[in-house]
């Protein structure tokens, strides 16, 4: 009977008097608010990852409703809208909720466990699937309605950090978006595609904190919830013990305002769902350097791929430059080691091989790949090298990933070799070293 009541309640929330679907975007800056849209990152940069927050801390309460949050600076909250599920999908979706999987999702939502609900949907919903059945269309509509209930609100944070509270809203109900995954993106070079992406994971209270990246060219960075990545990466977000400790010195540094937008989908006759995006402003004060764990024993393993797409096992240029950059930033107990099959075997096999060799002598494993995206003459007859990197950080004692990053940078030179070496040098000494110093 309780389960039936929960199912009826969720359906009444989803289908009763909901407005048309929109995109909600947020803009933040140090001096005021605007409602402009935020451009998406370059298509050449994949979704990356990662830092999170220690789950379940006492100060992570989201009892404060976004509608009543007032962080100062003349901020205001404009209530967004929740999309509807078309009537033609009701029967198929009702049949789904009568199944065991549907009942588990209903139970999870009724208890506010949004993380469990999204994980149940992971095995059932694939946004890239071409399968066109009544059930897949109903699930698609249901997921879209869930995503439209996501809201971001400012959170008190120390001067060096930004704080955000993520919630899932339906009318009068507000649930924390438990361990929701968001992508932080910022420009690191003059070229359009020169960006760094870091995935931030909210804690069990839907709260996330992160330091404002010192390497960002702009005083604003972009934070987005990716609708394509519907469910969180279990290897990162499901590990509470792997999440970084939350800073404590409170000081409000951001404010938010959503602006409803939408693009018509001519095929479906309804607005297309875009990512929830916000711009986060740098702290107005002059923050001290974010504290970094520089003394943790660390091994670096990076495999470089050349312009032909083949792995370069005879050189280790990017890893060597990264080691030099970290040593300049006063990291200690850090070194290079063999590749453990990076690029040839799954990541878990790489980690297992490293664990077998090091035992308990090394705490962190930093490993990944680099790839030459472009190496050609530019319009001014100079050579241009576009280099992409993907990096992961594994913590052996915690048995979990703590960070994932992707980055792209561009360098030019008078010769092919010069642009190539410059790109790898900058990627290691500057780009990757800066992001590790900021987020580790």
UniProtKB/Swiss-Prot annotation:
Name its cellular compartments.
Answer: Cell membrane
Keyword Cell membrane: yes or no? yes
**Source organism's superkingdom?**
Bacteria
* Lipid sites, type N-palmitoyl cysteine: 18
Return the GO cellular component terms, semicolon-separated: plasma membrane
User: Where would one find the signal peptide in this protein?
Assistant: 1-17
**Which residues, per the entry, are lipid-modified as S-diacylglycerol cysteine?**
18
The UniProt keywords, alphabetically, are: Cell membrane, Lipoprotein, Membrane, Palmitate, Signal
Q: Per its record, how is this protein called by name?
A: Uncharacterized lipoprotein TP_0693
Classification of source organism: Bacteria, Pseudomonadati, Spirochaetota, Spirochaetia, Spirochaetales
């Amino acid at each position: 009977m309780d389960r039936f009541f929960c199912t009826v309640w969720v359906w009444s929330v989803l289908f009763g008097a909901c407005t048309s679907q929109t995109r909600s975007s947020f803009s933040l800056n140090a001096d005021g608010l605007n409602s402009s849209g935020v451009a998406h990152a370059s298509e050449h940069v994949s979704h990356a990852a990662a830092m999170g927050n220690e789950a379940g801390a006492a100060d992570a309460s989201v009892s404060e409703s976004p509608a009543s949050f007032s962080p100062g600076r003349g901020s205001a909250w404009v209530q967004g809208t929740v999309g509807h599920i078309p009537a033609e999908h009701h029967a198929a979706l009702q049949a789904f909720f009568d199944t065991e999987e549907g009942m588990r999702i209903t139970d999870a939502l009724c208890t506010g466990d949004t993380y469990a609900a999204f994980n149940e949907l992971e095995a059932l919903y694939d946004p890239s699937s071409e399968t066109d059945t009544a059930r897949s269309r109903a699930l698609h509509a249901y997921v879209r309605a869930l995503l439209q209930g996501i809201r971001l609100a400012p959170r008190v944070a120390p001067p060096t950090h930004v704080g955000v509270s993520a919630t899932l809203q339906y009318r009068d109900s507000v649930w924390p978006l438990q361990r929701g995954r968001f992508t932080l993106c910022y420009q690191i070079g003059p070229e359009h595609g020169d960006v760094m992406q870091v995935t931030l994971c909210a804690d069990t209270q839907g709260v996330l904190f992160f330091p404002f990246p010192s390497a960002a060219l702009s005083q604003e960075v972009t934070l987005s919830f990716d609708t394509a990545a519907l469910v969180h990466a279990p290897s990162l977000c499901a590990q509470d013990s792997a999440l970084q400790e939350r800073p404590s010195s409170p000081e409000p540094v951001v404010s938010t305002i959503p602006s409803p937008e939408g693009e018509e989908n001519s095929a479906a006759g309804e607005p297309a769902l875009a990512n929830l995006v916000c711009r986060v402003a740098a702290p107005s004060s002059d923050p001290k350097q974010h504290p970094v764990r520089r003394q943790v024993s660390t091994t670096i393993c990076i495999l470089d791929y050349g312009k032909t797409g083949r792995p370069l096992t005879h050189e280790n240029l990017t890893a060597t430059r990264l080691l030099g950059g970290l040593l300049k930033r006063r990291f200690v107990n850090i070194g290079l080691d063999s590749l453990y099959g990076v690029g040839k075997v799954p990541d878990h096999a790489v980690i297992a091989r490293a664990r077998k060799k090091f035992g308990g002598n090394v705490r962190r494993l930093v490993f990944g790949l680099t790839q030459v995206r472009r190496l050609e003459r530019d319009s001014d007859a100079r050579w241009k090298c576009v280099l992409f990197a993907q990096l992961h950080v594994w913590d052996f004692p915690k048995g979990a990933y703590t960070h994932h990053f992707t980055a792209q940078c561009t360098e030019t030179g008078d010769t092919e070799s010069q642009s190539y070496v410059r790109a790898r040098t900058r990627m290691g000494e500057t780009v990757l070293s800066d992001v590790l110093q900021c987020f580790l």
